[in-house]
C-alpha cells in the first residue's frame, strides 16, 4: 500500500465517521453483493450452437470490433482476464446456447453434462453460475413465437427446452453450493396491430405453469420471469408484458426480472423495486443502459445505476435481490466493456453503502426536505474514491484506469490473433 493511498484512506475514514459511516463495514457489506456478469458480451450473443447464425428475437449487437471469442475456451479466457480487473465477488450468467458438445444437441435435449466444463471452471474460479433458456436464434422461433406459439408441437418444444434448462440450472446450484437464478425471457410478439391479444397470453400462462411444474430445490434453483415493452419486429404487441409477468410472479411466487431497458424510455426500474418487493419473494435485476430503446449499451455510473444500487442498500434487500448485467456492445473491446460496466455497478453499490441513510430517513420523517436535499448533495463530495481504491487494493485489482493497460496488452497478445 502506498503512503498516498494510506493517507487518503485514513482521511476518508475520518470524514465518513463524522457523518456516521463506518467505511470498513461498508466494504464488508459490499462483499455480500456479487454481480452476475453475462457471458454474451464476449461473443455478441453468438453462442456455440450455431455461431455463424443470425441473432434474432428483436435484439441486436452492433459493431465489429475485432477479437470476439469464437469458442468456449476463448470465452472463458476472456472472462478470466476481465474478472482479474474487477474487485469483489462475481457470478457468471450463461445462456443455453453456450453448451459444449461434440455433436449437435437439440435445445429440448440439453443436459447438465453439456455444461460440465463451465461448472468445473466456476469451481476453479470460485464463481456461482446463473442460467437462461435461449428462446431465440432458432428455426422454431423464426415466426416470432415460442412459449405462446399457436402450434402445439412448437410450443411443446420450447416448454421442453425450458424444463431442460431448469434441470441444468439446478445442477449448477447443487454443484456450486449457491442457487442458480434461471431467467425466462421470450421474444413473442407481433409487428403490427394485433386483434387477439388474449389467446397468446393464455397459452403462455399454461406453458409457464407446465415449465415450473417440476419441484426443484430452492437452495439450488430459482425461477425468474422477464417482461419487455417491445422488440425489433414486435413493436405493436409483446405477449410477456410487464403486467403479465408481474401477475405471474405474484401469483406463482417466482422471482421477477426487471431489465433497465425493457420499459418505456421515461420509466426507470429503480422506482419499481420497492413496489415489486411487496408482492414477489425475490427480484432479478438486469442492469443495462437503454439509449432511446433497449440498445443494451455498457452500464455507466449514472443516475439510474446509482438509484438502483441505492434502492437495494437503503431497503436492505441483499438477500432478496440478485444483481445481473445485460449489455452487449460489439463496437468496443469486449473485455473492456465487461470491466467498465461491472466496475460501475460495484462503484454504485459502494456509494450507496457510504450514504448516511439513517440520518436522511430522520430528516425525511421529520418533513425537513430542505436538509434532506442538502445532505444528499453534500455527501456526494465526500472522499468516496479513496474508499473504492482501498477496496480494489484489498482484492488486488487496479484502482484507476491502469486496468486498461492490462486489457490493451491482452488485446495485443491474444485478441489480435483471432482476426
Curated annotation (Swiss-Prot):
Transmembrane feature ranges: none
Record-level GO BP terms: L-lyxose metabolic process; rhamnose catabolic process
One cellular component term from this protein's GO annotations in UniProt: cytoplasm
Pathway assigned to this chain's UniProt record: Carbohydrate degradation; L-rhamnose degradation; glycerone phosphate from L-rhamnose: step 1/3
GO MF annotations in UniProt: L-rhamnose isomerase activity; manganese ion binding
Catalytic class of the enzyme: isomerase
E.C. number: 5.3.1.14
Top-rank taxon: Bacteria
Keywords of the record: Cytoplasm, Isomerase, Manganese, Metal-binding, Rhamnose metabolism
Protein location: Cytoplasm
Record note on cofactor: Binds 1 Mn(2+) ion per subunit.
Catalysed transformations (reactions): L-rhamnopyranose = L-rhamnulose
Cofactor dependency: Mn(2+)
Keyword Cytoplasm on entry: yes
Residues binding Mn(2+): 262, 294, 296
PANTHER family membership: L-RHAMNOSE ISOMERASE (PTHR30268:SF0)
Job of this protein: Catalyzes the interconversion of L-rhamnose and L-rhamnulose.
Quaternary structure and partners: Homotetramer.
Family: Belongs to the rhamnose isomerase family.
The protein, known as: L-rhamnose isomerase
Organism: Shigella flexneri
Amino acid at each position: 500500500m502506498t503512503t498516498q493511498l494510506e493517507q487518503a484512506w485514513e482521511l476518508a475514514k475520518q470524514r465518513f465517521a463524522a457523518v456516521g459511516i463506518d467505511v470498513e463495514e461498508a466494504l464488508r457489506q459490499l462483499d455480500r453483493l456479487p454481480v452476475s456478469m453475462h457471458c454474451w458480451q464476449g461473443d455478441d450473443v453468438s453462442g456455440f450452437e450455431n455461431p455463424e447464425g443470425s441473432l434474432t428475437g428483436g435484439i441486436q449487437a452492433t459493431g465489429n470490433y475485432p477479437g470476439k471469442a469464437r469458442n468456449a475456451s476463448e470465452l472463458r479466457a476472456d472472462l478470466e482476464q476481465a474478472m482479474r480487473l474487477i474487485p469483489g465477488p462475481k457470478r457468471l450468467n450463461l445462456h443455453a446456447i453456450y453448451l459444449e458438445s461434440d455433436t449437435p444437441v437439440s435445445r429440448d435435449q440439453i443436459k447438465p453434462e453439456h455444461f460440465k466444463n463451465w461448472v468445473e471452471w466456476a469451481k476453479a474460479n470460485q464463481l456461482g453460475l446463473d442460467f437462461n433458456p435461449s428462446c431465440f436464434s432458432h428455426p422454431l422461433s423464426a415466426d416470432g413465437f415460442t412459449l405462446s406459439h399457436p402450434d402445439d408441437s412448437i410450443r411443446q418444444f420450447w416448454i421442453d427446452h425450458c424444463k431442460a434448462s431448469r434441470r441444468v440450472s439446478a445442477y449448477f446450484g447443487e454443484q456450486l453450493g449457491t442457487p442458480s437464478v434461471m431467467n425466462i425471457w421470450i421474444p413473442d410478439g407481433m409487428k403490427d396491430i394485433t386483434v387477439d391479444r388474449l389467446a397468446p397470453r393464455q397459452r403462455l400462462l399454461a406453458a409457464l405453469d407446465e415449465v415450473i411444474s417440476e419441484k426443484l430445490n430452492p437452495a439450488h434453483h430459482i425461477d425468474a420471469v422477464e417482461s419487455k415493452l417491445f422488440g425489433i419486429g414486435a413493436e405493436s404487441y409483446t405477449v410477456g408484458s410487464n403486467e403479465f409477468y408481474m401477475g405471474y410472479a405474484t401469483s406463482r411466487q417466482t422471482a421477477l426480472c426487471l431489465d433497465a431497458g425493457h420499459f418505456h424510455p421515461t420509466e426507470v426500474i429503480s422506482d419499481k423495486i420497492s413496489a415489486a418487493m411487496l408482492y414477489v419473494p425475490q427480484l432479478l435485476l438486469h442492469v443495462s443502459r437503454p439509449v432511446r430503446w433497449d440498445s443494451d449499451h455498457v452500464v455507466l455510473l449514472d443516475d439510474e445505476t446509482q438509484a438502483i444500487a441505492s434502492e437495494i442498500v437503503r431497503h436492505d434487500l441483499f438477500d432478496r435481490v440478485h444483481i445481473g448485467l445485460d449489455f452487449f456492445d460489439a463496437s468496443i473491446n469486449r473485455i473492456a466493456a465487461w470491466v467498465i460496466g461491472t466496475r460501475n455497478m460495484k462503484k454504485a453499490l459502494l456509494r450507496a453503502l457510504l450514504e448516511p441513510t439513517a440520518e436522511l430517513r430522520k430528516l425525511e420523517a421529520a418533513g425537513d426536505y430542505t436538509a434532506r436535499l442538502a445532505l444528499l448533495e453534500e455527501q456526494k463530495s465526500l472522499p468516496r474514491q479513496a474508499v473504492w481504491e482501498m477496496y480494489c487494493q484489498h482484492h488486488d485489482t487496479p484502482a484507476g484506469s491502469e486496468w486498461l493497460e492490462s486489457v490493451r496488452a491482452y488485446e495485443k497478445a491474444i485478441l489480435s490473433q483471432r482476426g
